[in-house]
């Protein structure tokens, strides 16, 4: 959150001298750019199943609170490093104008307010991929809250629901307590893995990694299938197999199918167009087909041809993603 000045191998520049930000580039580092700005010590990033980006950032310890942020292209979440050191006896705009709070009628119009304020010390996060636990966790973000004390720290879940063009929290609750987790991720085996600091402040001399599973779902056929699919050689998958897997219950499998289509180049445009243009295709299959077409577009502009028609699609998410891709 104290700024960055980074160059890509092609000379592209991301320059944010006084704020935390999210950057975007091609897999080879080219076309580096600032995607969103105004964050304070953001910790990790996670995509929802609709392709929206979320993060948690930290407060400045002056009476403000941590935030769950919907990271939007071109968005400004309000933080500047100068707010950490305001003039004596003067509140910075961060505090005086309550820029850290969710939007109200008095919020500055130029910033993208957080979805909500959250527990102290977000240090890592992950989004439930769709397999491994029970269905109550669908749409949930898992955030580790590192507060320096075992008694106060843990993992919380935040169930996010679309609200207009943004998100709202439907529910939040503790998932794991009496631990000092620093990060959290779902493994291909359906278990939730978390790194643990162990002893609190000062610096710990040991650490642990825990694996958490639901015994009622650990051996589900879908969990075992997901583990096998993630480990498979995707280069050998046929077009028909990839088409089916674009609609898989697990987000990671859908992404593998999407990226495999994209890696095959222009030959994928026809099958992807057929998927995304058919109202009978599963909703997630259509979205991942759209994103694969977007990946192909820089070298194959014809990949975007179907998208103009999709701006009038009956599915609002298909319309939204088509507009984003065309705007890029």
Located regions from the model:
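Beta-propeller domains with acidic blade repeats across secreted/periplasmic ectodomains
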Residues: 1-241
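Amphipathic alpha-helical scaffolding segments comprising HEAT/armadillo-like alpha-solenoid repeats
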Residues: 236-244, 266-277, 298-311
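Alpha-helical segment of the N-proximal tetratricopeptide repeat
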Residues: 241-244, 251-264
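Outer-membrane beta-barrel transmembrane domain signature of Gram-negative proteins
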Residues: 306-318, 322
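Short inter-helical turns and helix N-cap capping residues of alpha-solenoid HEAT/ARM repeat scaffolds
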Residues: 249-250, 280-282, 314-315
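Residue-level detector of extended alpha-helical repeat arrays and alpha-solenoid scaffolds
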Residues: 253-254, 283-286, 319
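Hydrophobic core positions within HEAT/HEAT-like alpha-solenoid repeats
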Residues: 243, 258, 273, 287-290, ...
């Amino acid at each position: 959150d104290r700024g960055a000045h980074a160059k890509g191998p092609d000379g592209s520049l991301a320059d944010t001298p006084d704020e935390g930000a999210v950057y975007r580039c091609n897999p080879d580092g080219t076309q580096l750019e600032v995607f969103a700005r105004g964050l304070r010590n953001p910790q990790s990033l996670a995509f929802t199943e609709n392709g929206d980006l979320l993060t948690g950032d930290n407060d400045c310890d002056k009476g403000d609170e941590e935030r769950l942020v919907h990271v939007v292209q071109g968005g400004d979440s309000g933080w500047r490093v100068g707010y950490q050191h305001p003039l004596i006896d003067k509140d910075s705009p961060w505090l005086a104008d309550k820029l850290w709070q969710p939007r109200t009628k008095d919020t500055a119009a130029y910033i993208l307010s957080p979805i909500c304020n959250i527990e102290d010390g977000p240090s890592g996060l992950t989004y439930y991929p769709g397999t491994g636990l029970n269905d109550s966790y669908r749409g949930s973000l898992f955030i580790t809250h590192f507060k320096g004390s075992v008694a106060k720290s843990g993992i919380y879940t935040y169930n996010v629901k679309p609200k207009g063009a943004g998100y709202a929290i439907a529910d939040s609750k503790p998932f794991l307590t009496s631990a000092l987790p620093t990060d959290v991720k779902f493994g291909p085996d359906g278990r939730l893995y978390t790194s643990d600091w162990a002893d609190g402040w000062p610096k710990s001399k040991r650490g642990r990694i825990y694996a958490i599973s639901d015994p009622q779902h650990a051996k589900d056929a879908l969990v075992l299938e997901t583990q096998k699919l993630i480990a498979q050689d995707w280069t050998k998958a046929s077009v028909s197999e990839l088409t089916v897997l674009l609609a898989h219950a697990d987000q990671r499998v859908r992404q593998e199918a999407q990226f495999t289509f994209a890696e095959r180049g222009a030959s994928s445009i026809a099958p992807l167009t057929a998927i995304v243009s058919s109202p009978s295709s599963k909703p997630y299959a259509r979205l991942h087909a759209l994103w694969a077409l977007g990946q192909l577009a820089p070298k194959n502009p014809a990949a975007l041809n179907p998208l103009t028609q999709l701006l009038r699609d009956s599915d609002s998410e298909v319309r939204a993603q088509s507009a984003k891709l065309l705007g890029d």
